[in-house]
Amino acid sequence: MNQDHLIVDLERLTVRAPDGLLPDVLVGTGIVDGYVRRSSVLGDLLVAFGSKGVTAVELAGDPSGFVTTYEQRFGKRVVPVDRVPAAIARHLDTAIVAGRPGRLPVDLDRLTEFQAAVLRAAATIPRGEVRPYGWVAKEIGRPGAVRAVGSALASNPVPVIIPCHRVVRSDGTFGDYSLGDPSNKRRLLVSEGLDVAAFESRAAHGVRFTGSDTTGIFCHPTCRHARRTGAGHLVEFASEQDARAAGYRPCKVCRPVAA
């Protein structure tokens, strides 16, 4: 029995099923994927999921457009549902607020191994911090693949939950964002406590790393350790090479690299 026959048979049940039962049954059997609406800093989101976890996140606009795009991208129907599987429901709202999956199951099976590795690395960037594309490339063992990293982040199917908004260009500019225009990237980072204006000012003046003259350690400027350094002890560097030449060693937490 194919999925269309099953849908017809379910619709022909002589006893009226509770509203929402048909979509929930279809999603539960894996015949189609489901989606729900959730709130976020950027407004309402449409969050899709399948049997293995969350598959897509988009800004809530025209649901029919979301459905069409989803089916084109994933080759599977997606329908609105009333109920979310417990394994997802338990952690979904927390993941959206935290900007990282945590214990929320996320299905990256439709991605290439490289794309999935890029997203897993991005998911480790702490809330309110940013890293350059080069950092992600080195984290996954592909230091020469900076441009490919950017492409993988641009096609991130689950933005907000996997925080591609925390990855910036090598010159410190924020760049594009897969979930709407670049201003959404700034809005998310501001909501996480990042002083966006200060970060952009440093970047515009060529500052890529900062160090503490008391510890002799240099960091990415948004690293939580760097932000604890008082202004009187803060040293700015244009490159990793400059920091090392001055006798500074890299932070073991943010692992600064030349982008």
Regions found by a protein language model. Give the residues of each.
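Phospho-regulated, low-complexity intrinsically disordered regions of nuclear gene-regulatory
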Residues: T173-G193
